[in-house]
Regions:
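Intrinsically disordered, charged low-complexity linkers and terminal tails
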Residues: 1-194
Length: 194
């Protein structure tokens, strides 16, 4: 996140304009090229963890719906192998109740409409949109498991307590959320809404 936080806006725009060279779409590779990986990161880089983090960095997000699902897995730094509908709903509501995030649920969303959405309606949207698309396009990292809404593939189990995994997952989630809202803000400026 430091690279994003302290980068000049003009340089950031250039970096994201060239997707194959965008360090935010392949941060571990970027550090590797600079010979900046520490020993633990080097071990992580050589395994399946790098592939998983790369998926998180590059998963399509035309809307921000996947963020609360990823945050449910991240679980405030205690990464989970599977999440229940209740955990997804809790993460979803925590995310969309923060600030004006609720505006991103639908084009004409108001706070009154948001507050009137039932848990059942939220769950329907969670399962039919972000969960469905992570299962479909998640390169096999996200899997359907009995008794839970969605899980991670078993090969990731040894990594869920790995400090590199925890740090990288947090950075990706934080960056993707900040990038999304920065783009939303710029679009609203262009549209004359700000």
């Amino acid at each position: 996140m430091d690279l994003f936080t302290y980068m000049d806006d003009g340089i950031y725009e250039i970096a994201i304009a060239h997707s194959k060279d965008n360090p935010f779409k392949k941060y571990l590779e970027f550090l590797k090229e600079l010979d900046e990986l520490n020993q633990d990161e080097e071990v992580f880089y050589k395994g399946i963890g790098r592939e998983f983090i790369s998926l998180l960095e590059n998963t399509s997000m035309s809307k921000v719906y996947k963020m609360p699902v990823l945050m449910a897995f991240y679980n405030h730094g205690d990464i989970l192998m599977e999440v229940s509908e209740e955990q997804l709903l809790s993460s979803w509501k925590e995310f969309f109740s923060t600030g004006t995030n609720w505006k991103d649920l639908d084009k004409n969303m108001t706070i009154q409409k948001y507050n009137s959405i039932s848990d059942k309606e939220h769950l329907k949207k969670i399962l039919s949109m972000p969960v469905h698309f992570l299962l479909e396009s998640g390169k096999g990292f996200f899997v359907k498991k009995d008794g839970v809404a969605i899980g991670l593939r078993e090969e990731l189990r040894p990594l869920i307590d790995n400090p590199v995994m925890v740090c990288q997952m947090k950075d990706v989630i934080d960056y993707r959320a900040m990038d999304y809202y920065q783009r939303r803000y710029r679009q609203s400026q262009e549209d004359g809404e700000v």
